[in-house]
């Protein structure tokens, strides 16, 4: 399904989830900020792909598709594709670790304020780049 309406919904929901990221940041729940930021980025980028008529893969990191389909994306986004792809890859690496941890690592003890701030900034930047191409964009 390549529905622009579905893509616009993803982008709208990504914007709404930024409030959750901010609430988690205020609660100093650093691991949850990282995890939720990854989900924001995933939704926003998959929304962008759908709006552009590109079926997103059912994986968490769509960076390779963004780069491969750069020419099909809105002109204003094309200049940001590399940084958007880097943000997607970066947060994807932390997706499970931030949520589940590992035998020798608890997420709350591993992630720091700086990690959370960086993840939140990636999420904000991604939504800001993608949002103009959502519900009322091109």
Predicted regions: what they are:
Residues 1-138:
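Terminal alpha-helical segments
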């Amino acid at each position: 399904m390549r529905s622009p309406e579905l893509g616009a919904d993803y982008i709208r929901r990504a914007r709404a989830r930024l409030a959750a990221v901010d609430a988690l940041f205020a609660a100093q729940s650093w691991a949850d900020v990282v995890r939720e930021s990854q989900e924001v980025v995933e939704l926003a980028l998959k929304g962008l792909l759908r709006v552009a008529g590109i079926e997103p893969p059912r994986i968490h990191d769509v960076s390779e598709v963004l780069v491969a389909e750069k020419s099909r994306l809105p002109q204003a986004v094309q200049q940001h594709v590399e940084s958007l792809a880097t943000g997607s890859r970066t947060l994807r690496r932390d997706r499970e670790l931030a949520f589940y941890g590992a035998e020798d690592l608890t997420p709350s003890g591993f992630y720091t304020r700086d990690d959370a701030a960086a993840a939140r900034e990636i999420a904000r930047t991604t939504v800001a780049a993608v949002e103009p191409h959502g519900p009322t964009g091109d």
